[in-house]
Regions:
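Glycine/charged-rich beta-loop-alpha catalytic/anionic-binding loops adjacent to active sites
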Residues: 50-61, 149
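Glycine-rich cofactor phosphate-binding loops and adjacent beta1-alpha1 units
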Residues: 80-82, 128-178
Length: 178
């Protein structure tokens, strides 16, 4: 059978986070390519709990988006509680960032995704493929243009210290950073 895999190769099933179903936050978690040998090989040994059958009729290319879609969905839908009319800024136009932008827009939020000039091809995917507003400059202006307080939600999909600093600067009081 064709399958897709989760990335949590090793978890502590008895940890408090794993027991509540949040094994992705287990402090002892090791992922493929990070703590455990990666999967860029012909064969890889994967725990059965990580595997999910690809339904008939779903292409491998589409199925390959399962894990990043789940990460983005969890961040935006489960954790950010985005509502229609919110203003959301996504930092980082990689696959997960673009998918976060999609789920944010799908939730009814006015959404912009931020990248560097060197991210032009990724920003083009966000703009053309997902109809997201893209920014390489004017980020502060966009964040503060409505009422001067900042955006409701910042999704940090870049994961570097500079993006966290920017998120803190741009989120409104009582806003959310994920």
């Amino acid at each position: 059978d064709a399958v897709v895999s989760e990335t949590a190769a090793i978890i502590n099933a008895d940890s408090p986070m794993s027991r509540t179903g949040l094994y992705n936050l287990d402090k002892d978690r090791k992922g493929f390519g990070y703590g455990v040998n990666g999967a860029m090989t012909q064969f890889v040994k994967v725990p059965s709990r990580c595997l999910h059958r690809i339904p008939e009729g779903v292409s491998i290319e589409k199925a390959a988006l399962t894990e990043p879609c789940c990460v983005a969905y969890n961040a935006v839908i489960n954790n950010a509680s985005i509502k229609p009319g919110d203003r959301v800024l996504v930092l980082g136009p990689g696959p997960i960032g673009i998918l976060c932008g999609f789920f944010s827009k799908f939730s009814g939020a006015e959404t912009a995704i931020v990248g560097l000039e060197s991210d032009s091809s990724r920003l083009e995917v966000a703009r053309q493929g997902y109809e997201l507003k893209t920014l390489t400059e004017g980020v502060n202006e966009w964040a503060y243009e409505i009422d001067g307080l900042g955006v409701d939600v910042v999704v940090d999909a870049a994961g570097v210290s500079e993006s966290l600093k920017l998120a803190i600067e741009l989120v409104r009081p009582n806003g959310t950073i994920v």
